[in-house]
């Protein structure tokens, strides 16, 4: 079998930090969407994916919500960076579904989040199949922690249901099994530290 290559650039938890600044001091910092995107080298066998939590957490995020009332600017900046797929993070629901939709309606990337359903009916953001330039068929499945139901105000989840991610992803894997060569899972959830040892499992900044 001929070897086929897939390159993935992955970001997550940008929390509204688009420019390379922490808003605390002068000088460029090693953080933010544009700093990450400056390292992307994209071709027909490359996917650029984000794992969620883009809309909330920075002064810019607060300005877009409180003053502009729309998250479309974040989508426009993601579009410029060439994202192909995103999933949703728990903080993306903080301002309610209309605000989240103002982002998704402008976003060119496909949103995949298998356990977000239309009031427990159909999947709102189903898994996708992406065929690379080299012919490799890649399944893309996204899921978010269902703890959103505990953390978030019910009115912010109006019109949707966030279900257990495990059976949701299992069903998606079964559905895609005979149609793809490999599957990429994007999960927004988990723990920052090992609960037994306290060892840090994730870091706030990572050089791409």
Question: Where would I find each of the regions flagged by the language model?
Answer:
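Acidic, metal/ion-coordinating pockets
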Residues: 1-208
């Amino acid at each position: 079998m001929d070897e086929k290559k897939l390159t993935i650039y992955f970001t997550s938890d940008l929390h509204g930090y688009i420019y390379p600044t922490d808003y605390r001091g002068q000088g460029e910092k090693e953080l933010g969407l544009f700093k990450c995107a400056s390292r992307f080298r994209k071709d027909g066998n490359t996917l650029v994916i984000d794992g969620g939590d883009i809309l909330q957490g920075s002064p810019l995020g607060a300005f877009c919500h409180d003053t502009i009332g729309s998250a479309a600017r974040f989508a426009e900046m993601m579009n410029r960076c060439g994202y192909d797929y995103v999933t949703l993070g728990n903080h993306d629901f903080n301002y309610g579904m209309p605000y989240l939709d103002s982002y998704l309606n402008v976003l060119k990337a496909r949103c995949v989040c298998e356990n977000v359903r239309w009031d427990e009916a159909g999947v709102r953001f189903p898994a996708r199949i992406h065929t690379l330039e080299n012919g490799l068929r890649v399944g893309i499945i996204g899921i978010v922690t269902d703890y959103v139901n505990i953390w978030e105000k019910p009115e912010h989840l109006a019109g949707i249901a966030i279900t257990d991610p495990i059976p949701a992803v299992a069903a998606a894997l079964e559905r895609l099994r005979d149609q793809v060569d490999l599957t990429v899972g994007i999960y927004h959830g988990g723990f920052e530290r090992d609960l037994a040892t306290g060892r840090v499992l994730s870091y706030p900044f990572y050089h791409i």
